[in-house]
UniProtKB/Swiss-Prot annotation:
This protein's UniProt keywords: Cell inner membrane, Cell membrane, Membrane, Transmembrane, Transmembrane helix, Transport
The species this protein was found in: Haemophilus influenzae (strain ATCC 51907 / DSM 11121 / KW20 / Rd)
InterPro entries: BCCT_CS (IPR018093), BCCT_transptr (IPR000060)
Protein name: Uncharacterized transporter HI_1706
Classification lineage: Bacteria, Pseudomonadati, Pseudomonadota, Gammaproteobacteria, Pasteurellales
Primary location class: membrane
Record family assignment: Belongs to the BCCT transporter (TC 2.A.15) family.
Residue intervals passing through the bilayer: 9-29, 48-68, 87-107, 139-159, 186-206, 224-244, 259-279, 314-334, 345-365, 397-417, 444-464, 470-490
Amino acid sequence: MTKRTSFNPLVIGVTLFFILLLMAMIFIAPEQTQALLNQAKSGIFANFSWFYVLTFSVFLGFLLILSVSSLGNIKLGQDEEEPEFSFLSWLAMLFAAGMGVGLMFFGVAEPLTHYLSDITAGSAEHKQQEALLHTLFHWGIHAWAVYGTIALALAYFGFRYKLPLALRSCFYPLLKDRINGKIGDAIDVMALLATLFGIITTLGFGSSQLGAGLEQIGWISQNSFALQVGVIVVVMCLAVFSAISGVGKGVKILSEINLTLAFCLLLFVLISGPTLYLLSAFSDNIGNYFSNLVQLSFKTYAYEQEHTSWFSGWTVLYWAWWCSWAPFVGLFIARISKGRTIREFIFGVLVIPSLFGILWFTVFGNTAVWLNDGIAAGGLGEFISSPEILLFKFLNYLPLPTITGFVSLLVILLFFITSADSGIYVLNNIASRDKSLASPAWQAIMWGTLMSVVAIVLMQSGGLANLQTMTLIVALPFALLMLVMCFSLWKGLIADKKYFSTKVNPTSIFWSGDKWKSHLEQMMNQTQEKDILRFLKNTALPAMRELRQELTGKYNLSVEINTLFEQEEPALELVIHKESMRDFMYGIKSVGREVSEQLINDENLPHIQHSATYEPYTYFFDGRVGYDVQYMDQDELIADMLKQYERYLSLLDDVGQELMAHEQTELAE
């Protein structure tokens, strides 16, 4: 029977109360509410800009430290797990995550705006270089550091600790089971509000740019507020339809088509613009960005008060926007990164999208400045106060403006729809009590309606500035929460490293010498799955039964044997139950591996006749790498099980191993 709702009542209740309170204030006292929002924005700019700057630098430094330390070897999953996607496919999906409405909106607008502002000085060439530097700083590694931090925490605790893929799970080392209580609910409320306003801000940018594009290609006479409302409603209806109708595969195909169109647009501008100059600028921009990265990472313009307004209106607002988008992008990255090592994960997340961002802004930004100073004769710069229209004005100076304008509109529209569709999924995930269950259709409709109404009301009362202000306000406590998350992740990783570094014999082959002939006979016969099944039934199962009888009869322990002979990899498990701690589990499964054709055809190895060989490998409750036990007899298997049980008991007695030994299955509720 389908549940009426998957919502956590407290989380959704507090979130809706905050939203409805804000809407009521805007309707009842619009001027006072606007003044209050402006005051809050000014207060954050004046008192917390330094906090945003240092926080983002901490996120980046934290990831870099993990990547170069031994903790970077830890897998996001069990030790034997392989990545779900190939390396190239994974990089392609990270590349896709780096695309969005923001690049279309700011690709031309931001570099040109910085170029024409007083934040840059000197010759035209130096101003252009500085303009690109500031743009790349806003869209580069720092943005991906905040995404990577939350994605790493989600993936690590989700795949390594087997916890739900939820924000509250990231605080397990600090809170243990309390993540299921009121503190966990408070974490979800903060994440929900931050994500909600981050997505709504993107809706505002997308709707204004779509309206401007429709006006430019002549489909409408004016980009009015009413038109933008219509765009939001239509796009949200399409996103809700996608979310509730099970056309996810179709949306995935649309996303891939959209990425192709965006890349084609990029190539078109590169080829039709000053190609050689852009390629040279790309190299120059990379070098200039990385050589100035440390200084910019900590720059608050404390000694350049004349630029603090620019700093607040650009850098601080961007940092708040990235914080609000972190759960959204982080959850996507976490879901596709199972089986990667932490080092590999950090390299991919920080480098690949950032390099693409540098390429995008080089092609669009440098070309925009080149056009403005050349054939446009300053004509593009006249529109910097209306950034939503700049992309289309820019395309008018290149060949085929009608076609490229239409393609740009299509790309923005599809990014808009897929972002809203994914946003509904993420909001449902954060607000749900059980993350593993599908949410009923009415919840998608509710989120679509709520996002549309809030976006429209805020835009009507104060335009895009109000959307940015709300993002700035809700992102501040979430940024603080993410700092605590870093500490929690560090604590979990240290416990993980200590636990898995506990020495245990890597192999359990008992080469005592008195059975060498029988061992040699086994080695000279290529074992097949039927041989492993015989070993499990005739040797391993009697050994487990004998040990169970001793443990239950003499020591009154709760012991269970699971016979899993019918599954794809036949297996056998001995489980000793413990209250409040992880159960001890000693399993043996049939593991197959391919044999080289050269070995099969080698006349000196007549015993190798099959294309695959099978071995009985152990596996454990904590995901440690197992070992081959095919040469053990019944007594030796019992001795090996007791050796692993002794290790388990010693870890339970060690206070430092409490985190890894604590039972976590109830957290999946």
